[in-house]
UniProtKB/Swiss-Prot annotation:
GO terms for biological process: adenine salvage; AMP salvage; purine ribonucleoside salvage. It is an enzyme of class 2 (transferase). The gene is apt. The keyword Cytoplasm applies. Belongs to the purine/pyrimidine phosphoribosyltransferase family. It comes from Staphylococcus aureus (strain bovine RF122 / ET3-1). Its EC number is 2.4.2.7. One of its GO terms (molecular function) is adenine binding. This is Adenine phosphoribosyltransferase.
């Protein structure tokens, strides 16, 4: 299936000059969403994954159906102040400022094999932060899966030491 045909491109959103790749048009098509989920499940099964991790919010909508399909758990990565129990945190730089992501301190057990999922790889900052959180808890990142990779932003450089798959690539 050519998933690219299900991606909507929204020009000048969220700011002028950006061509936003909207995956909600994959999700609202059951066949396309199921196909994408199943492809990531196949990838995860080959890596003997114990748990799936995804950053808010679109990492949830990719990772949860994968975890459910595999009969394993899902651990969310959230912005600071959004998780109710004790957390670990990772602060990282943005173009203009910083951001903080957190995970529950008991979300990952040492030695667990982790798949990290998100909708899109752009600059790689969010996924790099998720990796740092998983590894701080003793997890082993055995794979990272995206629906879309924006190759022209070169985010893969931040995660080049990991096994990465994306279902759709944009070169420009």
């Amino acid at each position: 299936m050519d998933l690219k045909q299900y991606v909507s491109e929204v020009q000048d959103w969220p700011k002028p000059g950006v061509s936003f790749k909207d995956i909600t048009t994959i999700m609202d098509n059951g066949e396309a969403y199921g196909y994408a989920t199943n492809k990531i499940v196949e990838y995860a099964k080959d890596r003997d994954v114990d748990i799936v991790v995804g950053p808010e919010a679109r990492g949830f909508i990719i990772g949860c159906p994968v975890a459910y399909s595999m009969g394993i758990g899902f651990a969310p990565v959230r912005k600071e102040g959004k998780l109710p129990r004790e957390v670990i945190r990772y602060e990282y730089d943005l173009e203009y400022g910083t951001n903080v992501l957190t995970m529950h301190k008991d979300a990952i057990k040492p030695g667990q094999r982790v798949l990290i999922t998100d909708d899109l790889l752009a600059t790689g900052g969010t996924i790099e932060a998720a990796i740092k959180l998983v590894e701080k808890l003793g997890g082993i990142v055995v794979g990272i899966a995206f629906i879309i990779e924006l190759k022209y932003l070169n985010g893969i450089e931040k995660i080049k030491d990991y096994d990465v798959m994306s279902l759709i690539s944009y070169d420009e």
